[in-house]
A protein has these predicted regions:
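A short, charged/proline- and glycine-enriched loop
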Residues: 5-8, 226-230
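Short catalytic-loop micro-motif centered on adjacent basic/acidic residues
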Residues: 11-12, 36-39, 95-98, 144-148, ...
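Non-catalytic positions within long, well-ordered alpha-helices that form the structural scaffold/packing
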Residues: 29, 89, 137, 188, ...
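Short beta->alpha junction loops
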Residues: 13-18, 120-122, 147-150, 262-270
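Catalytic alpha/beta core domains of metabolic enzymes, predominantly
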Residues: 101-229
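Active-site beta->alpha loop and helix N-cap motifs at the rims of alpha/beta catalytic domains
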Residues: 5-127
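Phosphate/diphosphate ligand-binding glycine-rich loop within oxidoreductases
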Residues: 228-312
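Short beta-strand segments
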Residues: 12-15, 39, 64, 118, ...
Length: 312
């Protein structure tokens, strides 16, 4: 059995073009979410750090300048990035995001205890992902955030295994995109230090990003919840399904130690055994699954038993 760890810090990401718009967002971010990431790379004017610090009150505040190469909009120099992030810290921001590719091991000269060192691979999980994780951990940053586009189930499982092997309170790994949804739901169960969600509907800052309030309510991120088994929605596209919210609310109301997660697959017959084996190895056995398009007919063919009503 595992328990969704209370120590995972849930972070709501906010991306707006002006300081006033960011301050407006601060008033409507779910009050239960303890931390906010301010995406400075989306600002079209100079950041007013003292005003932003005041607007977000006592929440843990993370300043991020995501580069274009890693999925953001910032195109300035390394020196400009260092100056802006240092100014954020001086104004009372608690943490800053520093991309490893930009900073190397030096973290732009910023204090490691207030840095989230990050790497984002938009193409997929790199072949040397273990070595990359090691370099990031060696930087001395307070937190390590390794993110990659999950091109399919195999990538998602690699990221979950990576997270499971580094559950010491500093490390976070998850995937972007449809296949990455599984990792966003499960990485906190495997010891992720951080979990990122969109602050508001329609304002995701990365592909496949869930709402921060859904991470809290649906997947129990940031609050303890025992999990003895997983149940899953299996389909080609699963991001818009209400099934996780409905099932997890029922599990919690009934006091059942289970979690229902979305899993994007290409082939039910080929990938379901892989999924079951990988989850069992992680200590999260798959107790059952429901299926959606395009696997409904295939599910009847691979099932161990089929009731007579199937197909009617």
């Amino acid at each position: 059995m595992v328990t969704t760890p209370q120590r995972t810090l849930l972070v709501a990401s906010v991306s707006r073009a002006t300081n006033d718009a960011l301050a407006e967002a601060a008033r409507v971010v779910d009050a239960r979410v303890p931390a906010v990431e301010v995406r400075l790379d989306a600002l079209e004017e100079a950041p007013d750090f003292p005003a932003l610090r005041a607007a977000f009150g006592g929440r843990t505040l993370l300043a991020t300048l995501r580069s274009r190469a890693e999925g953001g909009r910032f195109q300035g120099s390394t020196g400009e990035a260092a100056a802006l992030l240092a100014a954020a810290l001086d104004a009372g921001f608690d943490l800053v995001d520093v991309e490893l590719a930009r900073s190397g091991a030096g973290l732009l000269g910023l204090p490691g205890g207030r840095v989230v060192v990050s790497a984002h691979d938009l193409e997929g999980v790199p072949d040397d992902v273990e070595a990359l994780a090691g370099r990031m951990e060696a930087s001395g940053a307070r937190y390590v955030k390794l993110v990659a586009t999950a091109r399919g189930l195999g990538d998602a499982l690699r990221l979950l295994r990576l997270q499971s092997s580094r559950a010491g309170g500093r490390f976070t790994a998850f995937g972007m995109g449809e296949a990455g949804l599984l990792t966003r739901a499960l990485s906190p169960c495997l010891g992720a230090a951080l979990s990122f969600g969109a602050a508001l509907p329609g304002e995701a800052t990365a592909p496949g990003q869930l709402l921060a309030s859904d991470l809290l309510d649906v997947y129990a991120v940031g609050r303890p919840r025992p999990v003895e088994a997983l149940f899953a929605l299996l389909g080609g596209r699963v991001s818009h399904s209400l099934s996780p919210a409905l099932h997890n609310a029922a599990f919690e109301a009934l006091g059942l130690p289970a979690l229902y997660v979305p899993v994007a697959l290409r082939s039910l017959r080929e990938e379901l055994p892989v999924l079951r084996g990988a989850l069992s190895a992680l200590g999260l056995p798959l107790g059952g699954a429901s299926v959606t398009i395009p696997f409904k007919e295939e599910a009847a063919r691979v099932a161990g038993a089929v009731e007579g009503s199937v197909g009617n």
